[in-house]
Every structure is written in C-alpha cells, then in structure tokens.
C-alpha cells in the first residue's frame, strides 16, 4: 500500500483555519471550569521572531493545550512590548515614523507566530503603544501619585551629550554611550520616581512563598533588594594635616555604614563617594581632586561594574579618629567604588576581610590587619595572600573582642558605640539598609508613554485631570536630530493649567518601558475595561499560574512587576499581592558559529562534512574552508541565526515545535542542529505513515484495554506512558515526555504496520493506545494530532478533546528489576515479582548464569538485599 507523505504546509494551514473559524481558543471568564492563566513574556516587535521565541511560545502553548484538555478554562493571551529606543533609531536611520515601523513589525511577527499554531486568544491582543493601553497606564500613574507612590526629585543620571538622553547604567560601556560612543556625563536632573522602596520588606519576605520560582531567581532578587543589618558609625575628623583646611569647614565628623563593625580593629582607611559632601567641599580648593572626581564620573555606576573596575582612590589629607582606639588615625580617601546612594556614601575599609578593600590596600600600600581567623587555625600561623578571608571564625588582634565570634562581636561593638558619645550623640546606631533604590521612570524619549503631569509657573507640578486623559503622543514630530522631539514640540507642550487656567507646559519625559511590562498581565484579564482592570475579573484570573521567560529578566522586569501588583492593589485595581505563582525560565537556543578571513559566515552558507574523523566546514560559494567556532546564543552580529520561517516552510511548525521540546531539558540551552531538526521531521513522517497504514481498520474499531496476553501488555504500556507523560507535562519536563513518546511509538509501530493480522482484542487495545498517543502529542504537535485523530475517525477536533484517563490498575508494576553486584561490582540484573520475598530473590539471583559462572564452586558468604533497590552477592 502506497502512503502519501505528510504535507505539513497544507495540513497546518487547514487546521489553523478551522481553529480560527471555530474560535476555540477564545476565553471567557464566564465559562465553567477551573481557571488557569498561562503567559509567556510578550515580545518586542523587532520585525522578525527568532528561534528563542519559537521555544518560549511553544512551551507556553504546550501548557495551555494540556491544561485545556484537562478541563480547565485557560487564558493564553499575546501582546507586544512596543515602546522603546529601537523604534526611534529606525526613525532616524530609515526616515520612518516609530508608530508606522512598530505596527508594521507587529503585523509581520503576528503572522509568523500564527504559523506556529499557538492556541492564543488573539481577541485580547494589544500593544503597549496602543493609545487604549497607555491611557490606562496614565490612570495608574495618577492613582499611584495620589497614594504617594510617585515622587519627583533630583537624581544623578548618566547623560549622553550626543543622543541627549539619560542612559541606564547598563547602557554605559567603558564610560561611553552604548549607541553614540560619546563620553557620558554625570548630571543631576529632576526625575520622576516610583517609590518601590516602600515595599522593600514585603518584596523580600514574600520571596520565600514563591516556591514555584527557580531558586536562582529568588536569590538574585534577594541580593538586589539587599537587606542588611548594620551599624551607623560616626568618626571624628582630624584635619590638622589638611593642606586646604578651609575647604572642609563645618565637617567635624563622617558617618559610615557597615555590616561588619566586628572588624573595626582591622580598619586601615575610610573611603568616600565622589558625591559625598566632604568630597565636594574638599574639591572646591583642590584642582587635582576635581579632576579625579570627573574621571570617576565617566564610568558606569552599577555595583557590578564597580566591582570589576580597577579600584582607584585619592588621599585627601583628612584623618579619621578610630572610634574604638582614639590613638589611631586612619587616612580618608575619595574612591571610585563607593556609591552615594547606598548607606551614607562612606565606608571604612578592612582589607583582611573584604576583597575590594584588600585590592585597594595593596594598591595604596595600606596596612592589612587580620582580625578574624578560622576556629581551627593557629593565630600566629594564619596569613593572607591575595584573597581576603570572609569566612566565620573567632576574633583576634581586636582588644576586648578577642575570642568572640564575629556575630557576638557585632553586638558588643554596637552596644559599646551606642553608649559612647561624640558631639553629644551616640557614636553608633543599629540600622537596617536596603540596596534597593526608588525606580526612576523618566526617559527623555518620544516613543514611550507620556507622563500625565503639567508644569505651571504659578501652581507648580499639577496632575492631568483624569477626565482629560489620555495624553496622546503627537504624530507630527521629526527625528532629524538627537534628543527628545517632545521637548521641541511647542504646540503639544502648551496647555492650560488645570488648577489656575494659565498657560503651562506638559511634562515632556516619557515613562521607562519597564512600566509598560509591569502590569500588562493584569490588562489581559479584561482588555476591554474602561479602568485599567475589571477588578472582579482580575480576581478570577490573577495571579498568573505559569509565567515563562528568560532568566535575563530575573531582576528588573520581575521585581518591577511584583512592585506594580502591590501598588495596583493599594490603588484598588487588583486583589492579589503577587503577579506570578509559577515562574519558568527557559534556556536559550544556541548554534555553532562559523568564520573566515572576512568575518562571520551564516549557517546556510556553509556545508559540514566529516573528514578523518573531524567535522570541517566549507563555504557553499567557493568551497573555501571556514573555521567552526564556539556554540553561542543566536545573534545577528555573529550570523548564527536560523529563520523560523525557513524551518516552517521546509519542515512544518510541528517539526520545529517538536525539536524545540525534545533536545534538552527546557531550563537548559538547546543546541540547534540540522540533524536534530531532520530527526524530528522523520518522526513526524513516521507517525503519519503508521497512522495512514492502520487507519482504514482502526477507524472502525472501538477502543478498549486488553485483558490478557500481548493485548494486556500493550495496554499496560499505553496507560503507563499516559501516566508518565501527564506527570512530565505537569512538571514542564517536555524533553522527558518526548522521549517516552518515541519509545511508545517503537512499541506500537510493528503492530500498526500489521494491523490486519491482529485479533480483535489486540485491535481494540491498539486503537485505545493510538487514541492515547494522539492526545499526548496534541499539546506538542497539534496539527499532526488533528490529522491523525481525523484519520482514525475522530468526530470532534482533537483540540477540543478531553485528556484521557489512565487505569490505575494497569499502571501498577507487577515486577521489579534489580541490579546484581558480586563483591560490590555490578554484573547484571535480575527481574523478580514485586511480591517476591528475600528467599525468592536469593533463589532467582543464584539461578542467574553470570552468578553461576562467578561462583565456580565457591560458596556465597552472604547476600545483601536492599528491597526494590539492589542485590550484592559477597563471595
């Protein structure tokens, strides 16, 4: 019998059209069934989806389809994170308006995503640049302003003088703007802030409740929030050696914040931020210090960047009096690694027990005094090389602290300094600090959500009345020069003050695009609502049960979303505290890189051959050899990208989906390979061939589990596979589910190819097994599952079928296989009934041929049996 090959292009388009026509993926909050909300992080509309998108959205779709089959009312929406810098860059480079560029890209990417057969409720689609969306975002801004969670204050920012905008710390590379290459300036600008610090304690405490989040993400957020117990320590200043003492008048002390006051006897210097008031005062009369400060301001100010940058300091001539030993004076430095916005902008350095301080001390030849030693170490023998000792131990070289643990020493120092007085005040004070800082949301950009505030010369800053929202971006703007077009648009800026009616100016800053993505999940629950949410409907869906996205969003996006949920609850828009119950961070899609003398070479320009046991790569154009490089994340810059459209056109969406799920655990990177995608395609064709051969007979057979013989064994395999795959999908272990389905088809294939020769009981068991198989592949390869289900006589869409129920009696194992060791070395296995007692197991083991061969007349000294685990024969 000739079987026509499965044509994915034709069949996938057919089933997608049927799904659309029947609107089977549209969700109503009024539908019966337990609600389940699955959401993948929505994409930026760059113009093309990449294989990372394919993997991410396939995973979410598997969850959505599986939960739907389990009878749940599933919400699985899609939208676009559409504001941002790239659209303005495109406007400048290509003379196209950001709005036109963005919506063109959305249309192209929507078409690509729809080709994947995703079970998305497209009726809820929105882009964050839709006026309808940012109108509601402006409502939220005003609500938070009324609640005191929005403030306007002066902040130091990274200013790009060419692009004329504020840059995030991450956008400053070696002191230069990431796009313009200009030397970045540190400026003080008045900015809008969300008071995320108001929720610092709650954001930290609730991390322990997020048990369905990866531990790594929770640790990253914990460190970012950075709660620390410490001590404010006030140091008296000795300015007698200061060349320009008049510049430091009025400063008689410096307050440091430290989490390690136990190490005070190891202190050898104080370091101040370049923005510390003492540093600024000293710089007024010191040109060299001013130059040093300007140099420090040219670098990135992120904690991460400062930790890796070379430690640099400027010795001021000021000395600090040691609070526990007034006879000791420590030099005061201005240093590039001290941040003004953490603690007090001043620290004391204990080189022996902090690596940063040790690096600094080595560079400037400062004393290194060990004050904590491991408990087991001999005090006189314990030394340091180039690594600070940061472990626990006992205090040494620390006067009245000697012999205490660092924890106890902390308390003793705190009590001592709280009683000791300097200038009429306690010299020490216990305190709690957070690394978390308020979220600056002002951006000097056009393509963002306008901040709904008005500046009036008479009334000050006035919120736009809610009735006057939305503040809509003007479209008559030009991008012929850098900077913010809104700041040059006089007619848009000019508005009557809502309070006094006099001419006033609109705020020209727009919101950070992270604001847009901090609440979109809530809008999806009722995108038609006049308010930002329909609170009753939101309460039915939120929090999102399963959120899927990259670990690169572990801190900013996910932390901001958690803050926003709390802020929106305070404003009466939602009832929940947390936005996402479950979080899954998938790995990246990576690919080999190829390079020749001219640069990077794309995979489709290369042929790979095996020569002398080695893989070699040659350009298709001239057969010149290219170097096979490392496996890296797909990127346009290295040309190691694979276009999903090409894969779908060549192999079909189901093949792409199957490969994305099959090759490695979903939390790990998947290595793209042509052989891998071809293997997935062969499996698709094999499935169809088996179904097409057997369907004429099986479509007439009623499914039923076998009761005896081979039919019973087949049904056991079917029900056990169903049980295992169900467990895998619940755990998002997609690759394990795929492996089981490969094995299951291997069991069924010989029977499917000879179905006419089977007895009636086996045919019924095989029909049930195939029904199970179709149901199990449906979340992963939905088009193929529909085609197979229809060929087998299915009267409804596979996408509307319930998940099968396995028979618990058929999944019970009646035998167990145990590894058999002889003198501790494995020699083979033994299979015994689950109910076998020790004597029966011993008898079965002694009957094994490899055991008999090892005995060779010897007697068994003893046999160790660990039930259901292992057997060890000791000779």
UniProtKB/Swiss-Prot annotation:
Motif ('KMSKS' region) positions are: 633-637
What superkingdom does the record give? Bacteria
Localization terms from the record? Cytoplasm
Q: Does ATP-binding show up as a keyword for this record?
A: yes
Q: What is its main location?
A: cytoplasm
Give the classification, highest ranks.
Bacteria, Pseudomonadati, Pseudomonadota, Alphaproteobacteria, Hyphomicrobiales
Q: Which UniProt keywords apply?
A: Aminoacyl-tRNA synthetase, ATP-binding, Cytoplasm, Ligase, Nucleotide-binding, Protein biosynthesis
Residues annotated for ATP binding in this entry: 636
Q: Which HAMAP family match?
A: Leu_tRNA_synth_B
Any idea which GO molecular function terms this record carries? aminoacyl-tRNA deacylase activity; ATP binding; leucine-tRNA ligase activity
Single GO cellular component term: cytosol
Q: Which family does the record claim for this protein? A: Belongs to the class-I aminoacyl-tRNA synthetase family.
**UniProt xrefs under PROSITE patterns:** AA_TRNA_LIGASE_I (PS00178)
The record's listing under Pfam families reads: Anticodon_1, tRNA-synt_1, tRNA-synt_1_2, tRNA-synt_1g
* GO BP annotation list: leucyl-tRNA aminoacylation
Sequence motif 'HIGH' region, location on chain: 43-53
Q: Which organism is it from?
A: Bartonella bacilliformis (strain ATCC 35685 / KC583 / Herrer 020/F12,63)
- Keyword Nucleotide-binding part of the UniProt annotation: yes
Protein name per the record = Leucine--tRNA ligase
Its Enzyme Commission number? Answer: 6.1.1.4
Recorded catalytic reaction(s): these are:
tRNA(Leu) + L-leucine + ATP = L-leucyl-tRNA(Leu) + AMP + diphosphate
